[in-house]
Amino acid sequence: MRDIKKFQKTVWDYYNQHKRDFPWRKTKNPYHIWVSEVMLQQTQTDRVVPKYKAFLKQFPTVRSLASASQKDVLERWQGLGYNRRGLNLKRAGEEIVGRLKGKIPTEVDALMALPGIGDYTSKAIITFAHNTPLVFIETNIRTVFLDYFFQNTHVLVHDREILRLVEKTLDIKNSREWYYALMD
């Protein structure tokens, strides 16, 4: 097993040289982060940037999203594909405004109870909005860990094994930025 400290240094060094600039990385607003996370599911970042900006211009708050028509949400979602994501975003917004008095939950289970929000998305929202050190993986993070720690193996590596490494390497003081570094 390769050294954890060396891995962390490698990731931070790369990030400091190649950090990508996205609008959702400049906010701690959980609604904005949630919108970005849903848009980024199976969609390239370059395609998401203009859609994200336009969506938030039309629906700047969870209340504005909840009160919008399905038609307006789907028109703004056009070009991202998987319309169900946009519809779930609206339905979850309606629940947040109605049942949760407009407050986006800060607990994983409460977020996962909303339409369209799973384990990764719930933890990403909390981590990126509140810098809470939660353990999660997505495709890019998985690839980084496989390439670094399992580069010479041809064995199937289970997510639980990768999650243990994610937990060991997590920068608990700056988890938000650490995950951005892993994704870059």
Which residue stretches match the model-derived regions?
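Catalytic cores of DNA base-excision repair glycosylases
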Residues: 2-3, 10, 14-184
